[in-house]
């Protein structure tokens, strides 16, 4: 468990690739620089796709967890 308090939450449960990352892109766009987004997903491909997304665009993946088929990610948006 983390002590991160997100500024926004993206619930992508039940969605499959590429929808979670497409929604993530839109949510990050709407987040203020330095803002924290929590992503909840059930698609196992997010374990690969979300870290790559963050790395490619320069956002910080602070933590990721898996619990009974649910994947949780805490992403800090890069500064402008």
Swiss-Prot record:
Assigned keywords, A-Z = Cytoplasm
Q: Which GO terms describe its biological process?
A: tRNA wobble position uridine thiolation
Q: Where is the active site?
A: 17 (cysteine persulfide intermediate)
A Pfam family of the record is TusA
Report the InterPro entries cross-referenced here.
Sulphur_carrier_TusA, TusA-like, TusA-like_sf
Q: Which residues cross the membrane?
A: none
List locations, semicolon-separated.
Cytoplasm
GO CC terms in record: cytoplasm
Give the family, as the similarity comment puts it.
Answer: Belongs to the sulfur carrier protein TusA family.
Report the protein's function. Sulfur carrier protein which probably makes part of a sulfur-relay system.
Recorded protein name is Sulfur carrier protein TusA
Q: Which organism is it from?
A: Pseudomonas putida (strain ATCC 47054 / DSM 6125 / CFBP 8728 / NCIMB 11950 / KT2440)
């Amino acid at each position: 468990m983390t002590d991160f308090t997100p500024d926004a939450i993206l619930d992508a449960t039940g969605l499959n690739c590429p929808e979670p990352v497409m929604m993530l892109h839109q949510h990050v766009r709407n987040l203020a620089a330095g803002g924290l987004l929590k992503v909840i997903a059930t698609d196992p491909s997010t374990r690969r796709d979300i870290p790559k997304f963050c790395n490619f665009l320069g956002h910080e993946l602070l933590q990721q967890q898996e619990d009974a088929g649910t994947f949780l990610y805490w992403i800090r948006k890069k500064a402008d």
